[in-house]
Curated annotation (Swiss-Prot):
Thiamine diphosphate binds at residues 74, 115-117, 147-148, 175, 286, 367. InterPro entries: Dxylulose-5-P_synthase, THDP-binding, Transketo_C/PFOR_II, Transketolase-like_Pyr-bd, Transketolase_BS, Transketolase_C, Transketolase_CS. Catalyzes the acyloin condensation reaction between C atoms 2 and 3 of pyruvate and glyceraldehyde 3-phosphate to yield 1-deoxy-D-xylulose-5-phosphate (DXP). Belongs to the transketolase family. DXPS subfamily. CDD domains: TPP_DXS (cd02007), TPP_PYR_DXS_TK_like (cd07033). This is 1-deoxy-D-xylulose-5-phosphate synthase. GO terms for biological process: 1-deoxy-D-xylulose 5-phosphate biosynthetic process; isopentenyl diphosphate biosynthetic process, methylerythritol 4-phosphate pathway; terpenoid biosynthetic process; thiamine biosynthetic process. The keyword Plastid does not apply. Pathway: Metabolic intermediate biosynthesis; 1-deoxy-D-xylulose 5-phosphate biosynthesis; 1-deoxy-D-xylulose 5-phosphate from D-glyceraldehyde 3-phosphate and pyruvate: step 1/1. Its cofactor is Mg(2+); thiamine diphosphate. Binds 1 Mg(2+) ion per subunit. It comes from the Bacteria. It holds the Pfam family Transket_pyr.
Length: 636
């Protein structure tokens, strides 16, 4: 790396640099990010787009006294590098390494932890109100993307801040693309401000004209100012934000450090809320990412020369199978519609979008709206499928209850990324959906053991007459052959995969295959385990489970989900409701804490939901000597 990069280890080190130095540093930082993410994987395109913006912010502000809140937070790599974490940057998103998102435990410069979108302005306003109550003078900047700005929470915060007149600055990082291309009226509005040369020139002309209007006396002056304000509202960009009580500045060139610093200084001279509109290019400085920013949003390790992944995928992912199944079903049934909240590629609905654009609806970052939109379609006789990550379904919990389940409407929830998701960590693991869905009347909850079973569950759900949720994991399936024809899975019917009388293993979703492998190993030690693929978390297969529990008396449940309120809890409730006595139960699942980031397989092992954990639990249930370490293959 260059001499400037090596010397910068804190925001304070930027203060002595001139603009030429800052521009050189930007290129060095960009190169460092590309080289590191090529080895580790991570969020690339968004970070390459905000290098100059981040440098300008830290040059202008005095962090951590002054506060920067990064919406979503996946674009905070330059911020991390500048705030003392350069030497640890090679550990980004690795187990026990740096988080890919702002983390207060890592640095006091990460004042607010983020991961989900549209939260930054609310947090910034909270910090600002506390500042004012304490009579402090901290400068508070929220950085939010144009994609995140489509989230309703962002507008709630803008409305409140504008109403209060609180002194906060909101930097709108406008790259015209969040993860996928932005949608909606706001996107079109920002696009017009950003790209319309006529509007830009007219704005300049109006400003010049208004500046020439003379002021004669206080009364006349006030009248003239009102006229000038009226003309501005008629003709100038940024009216939407001005109407909400913000002073609008921009749009600015987000890669021009001098222009950014100058305008940040000007913004600080304005008391009250200011929105600074900045245009950036996602993926800037790396041609593959510039040409395909969606592909380079979140990447696995890749080859720098061509951007191709270093990892070869051998099997279809669950998301791909979901998307392809939607296309097959959509060809046969024109009532099927697909709905997503700004994640068509991630969920696999992009396949459906390509084939049936008129039946595909991307609502932007608006999960609540997505769910209630689906209920309206269901009431009108359509068959809506809402494709959503488990972690983002949390945002629409009230709508699932109030709009879908109370009315018992046939909406299918395709819940992707259910379970451990790996490197994105606490904010993105999908560990709570069973707990919060299981408590709701009228909903059916399923989980497939493999990608073939997933397609049959989708078919079953779409042709059902009540709300159905299907949860499935991130990543590749097992490479099993996919049936050409779809079949209906009887509601509430599990699957006995192997029989035995010594111990019963009831597994859910991604844990079925490890349970089968554990049963095979146990059989080699003379222990006959029965394995049930639950398929349904709600309703349970009461007859199958009751018969096998009574027969085996020793039960293991295993799930890739939080133990509290999860599938194991459902089995305990079932045992209690049926007044079963003398039953030993061991629940395997995830603990009552937020799990860190790290490789999925590694986390499954250290949190004891892998094959070996099932084997050990079975041995302990079957033979009490195991507690003393006396089972076969172990020494006392």
């Amino acid at each position: 790396m260059g001499n400037i990069f090596d010397k910068v280890n804190s925001p304070e080190d930027l203060k002595s640099l001139n603009i030429e130095d800052l521009n050189s540093l930007a290129q060095e930082v960009r190169k460092f990010i590309i080289e590191t993410v090529a080895d580790t994987g991570g969020h690339l395109a968004s970070n390459l787009g905000v290098v100059e913006l981040t440098l300008a912010l830290h040059y202008h502000l005095n962090s951590p006294k002054d506060k920067i809140i990064w919406d979503v937070g996946h674009q905070s790599y330059t911020h991390k590098i500048l705030t003392g974490r350069k030497k640890k940057f090679h550990t980004i998103r690795q187990y026990k390494g740096l988080s890919g998102f702002p983390k207060y435990s890592e640095s006091i410069h990460d004042v607010i932890e983020t991961g989900h979108s549209s939260t930054s302005i609310s947090a910034a306003l909270g910090l600002a109100l506390a500042r004012d109550l304490k009579n402090r003078n901290d400068r508070i900047y929220a950085v939010i993307g144009d994609g995140a700005l489509t989230g309703g929470m962002a507008f709630e915060a803008l409305n409140h801040a504008g109403h209060l007149g609180t002194d906060i600055k909101v930097v709108l990082n406008d790259n015209a693309m969040s993860i996928s291309k932005n949608v909606g009226a706001l996107s079109h509005y920002l696009s017009r401000i950003r790209t319309d040369p006529t509007l830009s020139k007219f704005k300049d002309d109006v400003e010049v004209l208004l500046s020439r209007i003379p002021k004669i006396g206080n009364t006349v002056s006030r009248s003239v100012e009102r006229v000038k304000d009226g003309l501005k509202y008629l003709f100038l960009s940024g009216v939407l934000f001005e109407e909400m009580g913000f002073t609008y500045m921009g749009p600015l060139d987000g890669h021009n450090i001098q222009e950014l610093i100058t305008n940040f200084k000007n913004a600080d001279n304005i008391k009250g809320p200011v929105l600074i509109h900045v245009n950036t290019k996602k993926g800037k400085g790396y041609k593959p990412a510039e040409s395909q920013p969606s592909k380079f949003h979140g990447v696995s390790p890749f080859k720098i020369d061509n951007g191709e992944s270093k990892r070869k995928k051998s099997n279809f992912t669950y998301s791909q199978v979901f998307g392809q199944t939607m296309v097959k079903l959509g060809n046969k049934d024109k009532k099927i519609v697909g709905i997503t909240a700004a994640m068509p590629e991630g969920t696999g609905l992009s396949y459906f979008k390509k084939e049936f654009p008129d039946r595909f609806f991307d609502v932007g970052i608006a999960e609540q709206h997505a769910v209630t939109l689906a209920t309206g379609m269901a009431r009108a006789g359509m068959k809506p499928v809402v494709a959503i990550y488990s972690t983002f379904l949390q945002r629409a919990y009230d709508q699932v209850i109030h709009d879908a389940c109370i009315q018992n409407l046939p909406v299918t929830f395709a819940i992707d990324r259910a379970g451990i998701v790996g490197a994105d960590g606490e904010t993105h693991h999908g560990l709570f959906d069973l707990s919060f869905l299981r408590a709701i009347p009228n909903i059916i909850i399923m989980a497939p053991k493999n990608e073939n079973e997933l397609q049959h569950m989708i078919y079953t759900a779409i042709n059902n007459d009540q709300p159905v949720a299907i949860r499935y994991p991130r990543g590749e399936g097992y490479g099993v052959e996919l049936d050409n024809d779809f079949s209906t899975i009887p509601i509430g019917k599990g699957e006995l995969l192997c029989d035995g009388k010594d111990v019963l293993i009831i597994a859910v979703g991604s844990r079925v295959y490890p349970a089968m492998e554990a049963a095979r190993v146990l059989s080699q030690q003379g222990i006959k385990a029965a394995v049930i693929n639950a398929r349904f978390i709600k309703p349970l297969d009461k007859n199958l489970i009751l018969n096998k529990i009574n027969e085996c008396k020793k039960v293991i449940t295993v799930e890739e989900h939080a133990l509290k309120g999860g599938f194991g809890s459902a089995i305990l409730e079932f045992i209690n409701e049926n007044d079963l006595r003398g039953i030993k139960v061991k629940r395997l699942g995830l603990p009552d804490r937020f799990l860190p980031h790290g490789p999925t397989g590694h986390l499954q092992t250290i949190y004891h939901i892998d094959k070996n954990a099932i084997i050990e639990s079975a041995l302990k249930l079957v033979d009490e000597r195991v507690e003393l370490g006396l089972w076969p293959g172990k020494n006392a």
